[in-house]
């Protein structure tokens, strides 16, 4: 990231236009579910579409994509721990503006998990409070100990709400 001053290479392959065109109003629903820190499972084939949808959604939240260092393990919390409160605001400096607004949001830090393609070996990580995962394995859909709040089905292009969202 340091060699690319804007971090544009992180956003390569994420097509927000395609995401909004394909998922329409459901794009906003998914974004709200991520912001509310719900348990979201994206299910379907191919894996490329699975990951592209998730990265496109995460890229809609300002400054989150370059700050996913805690996303792979629920016990990590470096983003929240290393955060410093902005003392001044410089409108000409993007980093200053983001820090003043409290961004990036710590959505995937402590007790949260983000894995665009989650293998069966990481099923224990789904015991945390919030997660966004992608899978092609039906075992995840029928897991009793850590059921998702929402299943996003790539085949049917629909959201299935399994739990009450409040």
Predicted segments with their positions:
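Acidic, Ser/Thr/Pro/Gly-enriched alpha-helical scaffold modules and adjacent low-complexity linkers
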Residues: 1-166
């Amino acid at each position: 990231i340091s060699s690319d001053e804007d971090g544009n290479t992180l956003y390569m392959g994420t097509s927000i236009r395609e995401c909004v065109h394909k998922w329409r109003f459901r794009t906003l629903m998914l974004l709200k579910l991520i912001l509310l820190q719900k348990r979201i499972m994206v299910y379907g084939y191919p894996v490329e579409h699975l990951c592209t949808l998730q990265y496109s959604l995460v890229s809609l939240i300002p400054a989150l994509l370059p700050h996913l260092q805690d996303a792979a393990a629920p016990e990590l919390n470096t983003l929240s721990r290393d955060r410093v409160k902005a003392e001044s605001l410089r409108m000409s400096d993007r980093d200053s503006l983001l820090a003043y607004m409290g961004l990036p949001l710590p959505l995937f830090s402590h007790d949260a998990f983000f894995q665009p393609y989650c293998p069966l070996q990481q099923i224990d990580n789904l015991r945390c409070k919030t997660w966004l995962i992608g899978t092609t394995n039906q075992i995840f859909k029928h897991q009793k100990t850590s059921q998702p709040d929402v299943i996003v089905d790539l085949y049917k292009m629909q959201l299935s709400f399994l739990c009450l969202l409040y």
